[in-house]
Amino acid sequence: AFVNAHTHIGDSIAKEAGGGLSLDELVAPPDGLKHQLLRAASREEKVRAMRRSIQFMETTGTASFLEFREGGVEGVYALREAAEGLGVEPFILGRETVEAMEAAEGFGASGARDGEFSRERTATAEEGKLFGIHAGERDSSDINPALDLDPDFLVHMVHPEPLHLDRLADKAVPVVVCPRSNLVTNVGVPPIADLAERTTLALGTDNVMLNSPSMFREMEFAAKLADVSAHEVLRMATYNGARIAGLDCGVIEEGRAGKLLVLDGDSDNLAGVQDVVRAVVRRAGVGDVADVIL
C-alpha cells in the first residue's frame, strides 16, 4: 500500500479555495488564506473534514501519511481523533511549538525563511523523533539554512543548485517531492531525476486544499513529468516514504506488516496491459481498486 510522504490535511475544509493566489497568499503563516480559514472553522468542522480525507486515502490504498500538523498540541489531538477507527495510520509532525512535537511523532518546520528552528531541532533530536522542513519551494535561498539544521528529510526542493545537490548526496538527506502542488502554486517543478540520482526520494500530495490526496494521481504526474522509471516512481510512493518515517510497511517482505493494495488486473482500464508496473504508476486509479488490506 502507499505511503503519502507529505500532507497538510487540515485545509480539507477549503478544497479548491484561493484560485489564482500566489503560494504566500495561499499558505504562508500566519495570514495566508489557509491559516485564515483554519482559524475561522470550528474544531468539529476541521475534524470532520480531515476524517473525510483520511477515508479517501484509505479507499485509494494509502496505509500511512506524514502530516505537517498545524494548530500546536490541539492540532495533533484533532488529527488523532479524525483518524480514530480507520485503517490509515497518520504519522504526525507537530508544528509551531516544542510541546506539539512532544505530543506527536516529530516536528514539521515551515521553512528556514520563516524562523531559525534550532531550538525545535535540538528538542526533536533529544526526543529521538523525526524532523522535517520545507526547503527550496519558492527559490534556493532557504536550502542551505535548512540543511544546516541536519534535518531527517526535506520537502519540495524545486530549486536546488549544484551545491545543494552535492550537499544532499554528502549528507544523505532524503527529499519528499510534491510536483502537482508545485505546479498549482506556480513555483516550478522539482528536478526529480537529479534528486533521485543523489538521495532517497519520496512522493507527497501536500495540501488537500490544492490537490486530492491520491497517490495514483501523484505517481502518474511524476512519471510523466520526470525521466525516471516506473519502478522508481512506485518506490517513491511506497517504500521510500515508509523508510523516511521508519514505518513497517511500504514493501512486501517477511516479517513486515501486511498492508496491501489489490488492483483488478481485468478492469476495463487495466485489461490488456503489457507492463504491469508501468500501468500501476501511469494508468491505474481508484476505479481499479479491488481491495485494501490495512
Task: Give the ranges of each region predicted by the language model.
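Histidine-centered catalytic micro-motifs
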Residues: 2-12, 130-138
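Metal-coordinating catalytic core of metallo-dependent amide/deamination hydrolases
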Residues: 41, 68-148, 152
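Non-catalytic positions within long, well-ordered alpha-helices that form the structural scaffold/packing
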Residues: 51, 55-58, 100, 147, ...
